[in-house]
């Protein structure tokens, strides 16, 4: 993690078909959690020309107008006409949702809530680095910001000829573990057919790329590739089939940290694929914020139906102020990583998840949300509220 001289990460916009699918799945989850916080949800979505298929396993007392919900998400992203390539008003919505298996439920549900078992076996990772202000790797942070700016320029009318689908990629150069330059930038954006490539490239360079990336990291040899294949009129679900869970590296650390393989979107907090990955980020970020290390990666693993993690391991890549073994002892003392405890620690039983489904689950600022008369914190795993206690306990 600390040995690369050059590292590249990518991101995609909210209009990318895989991200559209993620947002639909998480919108379904949010709608259910609003009325039934203890629902079991595993919602998968596929989007393709003229159709959205929603499936999975859901056990809940809540009722959701699925068709209206799906159409609303599609239209919010501005897929509103066949000219753009996808129309939330006219596309077909197919519902193939079933209930959670009783075999899985018996492994999760317990008489004592704190004994709640993990919803599946698996391994999850959390990571943090002090190379950016949000304690995230720079390449993925810059990549997210580019496509966020693309959406902002499109929605505000600054660049009205932009369309929803876009991808970004940023290559950073490192010296002694610190970012010293950006060597390459790729930004491909869907657009209306009547804009010229010359106008598009000039506007995107000035109003998106230069507006977003730190000027001090751009240099005379930085490569810029804006719509390198030429026109990009056909996009979204017409150009590519979109599926929930296909952008797990975009969702996390851009490849800078390991990934256990489990996707996030459409899953309620009883699924440790999601909740334990969030807890891992929370732990790693507080360790770095406390100054215990410059970089930290934590792995946690579970067995289905078992509350206690089967393992907790940690690596600070030689940047720790104390030994990794001592940091693990602090983690065990300050963080309860049983599934039910994670849900309580991070207050996860709220409809906050659609907001996570584009532009990364990590490196986002926590903020207050109010839904259904209840106020809660979105992105609570980004808080650094345990850093002071960790620092005191470490004696540094």
From Swiss-Prot:
Essential cofactor(s): Mg(2+); K(+)
Region (Flexible loop): 100-110
Compartments, record wording: Cytoplasm
Keyword Transferase set for record: yes
Example of a GO cellular component annotation carried by this entry: cytoplasm
Residues in coiled coil: none
Example GO molecular function: methionine adenosyltransferase activity
Protein residues bound to Mg(2+): 18
Listed PROSITE patterns: ADOMET_SYNTHASE_1, ADOMET_SYNTHASE_2
InterPro entries noted in UniProt: ADOMET_SYNTHASE_CS, S-AdoMet_synt_C, S-AdoMet_synt_central, S-AdoMet_synt_N, S-AdoMet_synthetase, S-AdoMet_synthetase_sfam
Keyword ATP-binding recorded: yes
Keyword annotations: ATP-binding, Cytoplasm, Magnesium, Metal-binding, Nucleotide-binding, One-carbon metabolism, Potassium, Transferase
Co-factor binding details: Binds 2 divalent ions per subunit.
Annotated positions binding L-methionine: 57, 100, 240, 271
Entry binding sites for ATP: 16, 165-167, 231-232, 240, 246-247, 263, 267
Catalytic activity: L-methionine + ATP + H2O = S-adenosyl-L-methionine + phosphate + diphosphate
Pathway: Amino-acid biosynthesis; S-adenosyl-L-methionine biosynthesis; S-adenosyl-L-methionine from L-methionine: step 1/1
CDD domains: S-AdoMet_synt
Enzyme Commission no: 2.5.1.6
Main EC class the enzyme belongs to: transferase
Oligomer status and interactors: Homotetramer; dimer of dimers.
Primary role: Catalyzes the formation of S-adenosylmethionine (AdoMet) from methionine and ATP. The overall synthetic reaction is composed of two sequential steps, AdoMet formation and the subsequent tripolyphosphate hydrolysis which occurs prior to release of AdoMet from the enzyme.
UniProt record similarity statement: Belongs to the AdoMet synthase family.
Protein name (database record): S-adenosylmethionine synthase
Organism in which the protein naturally occurs: Marinobacter nauticus (strain ATCC 700491 / DSM 11845 / VT8)
Taxonomic path: Bacteria, Pseudomonadati, Pseudomonadota, Gammaproteobacteria, Pseudomonadales
């Amino acid at each position: 993690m600390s040995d690369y001289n050059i590292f590249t990460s990518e991101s995609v916009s909210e209009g990318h078909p895989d991200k559209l699918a993620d947002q639909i799945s998480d919108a379904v989850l949010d709608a259910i959690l609003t009325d039934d916080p203890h629902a079991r949800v595993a919602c998968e979505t596929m989007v393709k020309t003229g159709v959205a298929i929603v499936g999975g396993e859901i056990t809940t007392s809540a009722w959701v107008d699925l068709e209206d919900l799906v159409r609303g998400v599609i239209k919010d992203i501005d897929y509103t006409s066949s000219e753009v390539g996808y129309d939330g008003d006219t596309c077909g919505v197919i519902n193939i949702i079933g209930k959670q298996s009783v075999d899985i439920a018996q492994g999760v549900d317990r008489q004592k809530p704190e004994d709640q078992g993990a919803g599946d076996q698996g391994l999850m990772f959390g990571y943090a680095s002090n190379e950016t202000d949000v304690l995230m790797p720079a390449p993925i942070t810059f990549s997210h910001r580019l496509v966020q700016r693309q959406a902002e320029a499109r929605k505000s009318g600054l660049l009205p000829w932009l369309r929803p689908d876009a991808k970004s990629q940023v290559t950073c150069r490192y010296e002694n573990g610190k970012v010293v330059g950006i060597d390459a930038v790729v930004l491909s954006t869907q657009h209306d057919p009547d804009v010229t490539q010359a106008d598009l490239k000039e506007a995107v360079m000035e109003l998106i790329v230069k507006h977003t990336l730190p000027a001090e990291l751009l240099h005379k040899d930085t490569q810029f590739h804006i719509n390198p294949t030429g026109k990009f009129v056909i996009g979204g679900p017409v150009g590519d089939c979109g599926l929930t869970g296909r952008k797990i590296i975009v969702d996390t650390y851009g490849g800078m940290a390991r990934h256990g393989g489990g996707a996030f979107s459409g899953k309620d907090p009883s699924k440790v694929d999601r909740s334990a990955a969030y807890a891992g980020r929370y732990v790693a970020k507080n360790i770095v914020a406390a100054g215990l290390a410059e970089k930290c990666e934590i792995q946690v693993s579970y067995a289905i139906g078992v509350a206690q993690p089967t393992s907790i391991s940690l690596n600070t890549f030689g940047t720790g102020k104390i030994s990794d073994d001592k940091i693990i002892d602090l983690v065990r003392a300050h963080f309860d990583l049983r599934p039910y405890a994670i849900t309580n620690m991070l207050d996860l039983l709220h409809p906050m998840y659609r907001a996570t489904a584009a532009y990364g689950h990590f490196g986002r600022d926590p903020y207050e949300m109010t839904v259904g008369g209840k106020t809660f914190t979105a992105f609570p795993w980004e808080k650094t509220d345990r850093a002071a206690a960790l620092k005191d306990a470490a004696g540094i």
